C-alpha cells in the first residue's frame, strides 16, 4: 500500500481526501498535516469532522521540521489541500525528493507566471514545475497525468465547465467567434472553512460575484483553447455546482452531431453520466459524478453540468488522478 500524506487536512477538501484515502484499497493514510502554527494542530481529525468519529480519529500533525522529515523519508505520495501560495512553496520541496504531488490549489494550473501575479496576488517562483505540471482533468488528460510527477487538480468551476464544453470544442461544433457563456452556482463550501461574514448562516444568499475578474475564467479559457464569458454565483446551500452554459453552434450542426460528440468523449468514462434529463445538485451531492445533459434549438445549445464541488471539483478528481498515475482502475475507491 502507498503511504499517503495529506497537507491541509483540516479544510473541507482535505477532509474529503482523508475519507477517500481511508477507504481506498491501495492507499494507507500515513499522515494528516496542518501548518505548524495552526490552531487545529494536535486536534483529532474527527473532532473537526464529527461524521468520522470512531473511523478517522487520527491527530492533525503540525508540518514542522520533524513532520517534513517524516514525509520526505517515508511517504509515497503527497496531497496538498493548501492555500495557493503555500502549495507553490511546499510542492517543490516534495518534488525535489522524487515524491509525486497532487495539488488541489491553483498554484500550478496555468503555465504563465504573470497569471499568478494578476489573479492570485503572489509571485510564482517555480517556473520549472509550472512547465512540468499536468492538468488533472481526469477524463481528458490521462496520459499527461500518468507521465507527470506534479498533477495540478483543476478548480471546481473549471471542472464543470470544461467537462461540458470540451466535447463540443474538440468536435469543432462551436460557432467561430462565439464565446460560450457560463452561468454557474456553487455551494458555500466552495468558499472554504474559514469564517467570513458573507458565508455565515444569517448572511448567505444567492448572489453573483467575481464579474469579469474571477481567477477561474482564464483557467477555463486556457484549457478549453477558447475564450469564455464566466459568471459565478454563491449559492445558499452547502455543496455542489450547477453550471448552465449557452453555446452558439456552427451553421448546420445537427442534434445527432452534438449527441455523438458527448457519447464519443465519455464512452468508457464511468464517472461522467450523460443523464438525458437536466441534472440537479441533489443528484450529485456527496458523489464523485459529473452529470451532463443538453438541449438544442436551432443553432443554440444549452448544456447543464452538475458536480459536487468538494468531490469531482476537488478531492475525488484528485483520487481519479492517483488511480490513473499508479495504474489502478479509474474509479477505485470512489464507487
Curated annotation (Swiss-Prot):
Keywords: Amino-acid biosynthesis, Arginine biosynthesis, Cytoplasm, NADP, Oxidoreductase. InterPro entries: AGPR_AS, AGPR_type-1, NAD(P)-bd_dom_sf, NAGSA_dehydrogenase, Semialdehyde_DH_NAD-bd. Its main location: cytoplasm. Gene3D superfamilies: Dihydrodipicolinate Reductase, domain 2, NAD(P)-binding Rossmann-like Domain. Pathway: Amino-acid biosynthesis; L-arginine biosynthesis; N(2)-acetyl-L-ornithine from L-glutamate: step 3/4. SUPFAM superfamilies: Glyceraldehyde-3-phosphate dehydrogenase-like, C-terminal domain, NAD(P)-binding Rossmann-fold domains. GO terms for biological process: L-arginine biosynthetic process. Pfam families: Semialdhyde_dh, Semialdhyde_dhC_1. GO terms for cellular component: cytoplasm. It catalyses: N-acetyl-L-glutamate 5-semialdehyde + phosphate + NADP(+) = N-acetyl-L-glutamyl 5-phosphate + NADPH + H(+). It is found in: Cytoplasm. Its EC number is 1.2.1.38. Catalyzes the NADPH-dependent reduction of N-acetyl-5-glutamyl phosphate to yield N-acetyl-L-glutamate 5-semialdehyde. Belongs to the NAGSA dehydrogenase family. Type 1 subfamily. This is N-acetyl-gamma-glutamyl-phosphate reductase. It comes from Aeromonas hydrophila subsp. hydrophila (strain ATCC 7966 / DSM 30187 / BCRC 13018 / CCUG 14551 / JCM 1027 / KCTC 2358 / NCIMB 9240 / NCTC 8049).
